[in-house]
């Protein structure tokens, strides 16, 4: 007696979802004037090809300026925002670069400060973290964020 086994094949189909990502950087650190902030962000399609590039910066003074006090223009608090074109995922690089080192040489006087990094995709928060920034060395932050999962992961079709 022979048995015939029937195998069902399924194909999962996903709708390609593109989102406008908004990256926001903010810090309330009183001495943030001692730092330049540079941010770059590439948006990628489902195949990993870059489809857009945005950047923003807030430069107070050239590196090595050794400023003795904050500039006369208000620099506190500082915020940077950049928004991509529609894309599947992003890779962002954030650099916090000292232009003036701390006056004190004592570690306890120069504790890390916070830089809040938040990312939304079409208004939905997908990343919200406060990073610690070393007062002497600054920070380099890399973010690789895929698009948020759709409400319905996909539909299953029988072949």
Question: Each PLM stretch: what is its role?
Answer:
Residues 36, 116-120:
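Beta-strand signatures of extracellular beta-sandwich domains
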Residues 17-54:
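Short, surface-exposed binding/anchoring microloops in extracellular/periplasmic proteins
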Residues 55-107:
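Mature extracytoplasmic domains of secretory-pathway proteins
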Residues 1-20:
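Bacterial Sec-dependent N-terminal signal peptides
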Residues 45-54, 64-69, 123-130:
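Surface-exposed loop/edge segments in extracytoplasmic proteins
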Residues 128-159:
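C-terminal partner/receptor-binding element of secreted or periplasmic proteins
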Residues 83-89, 119-126:
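A short, structured loop/turn motif at beta-sheet edges
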Residues 107-115:
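Short coil-to-beta strand junction motifs in C2/discoidin
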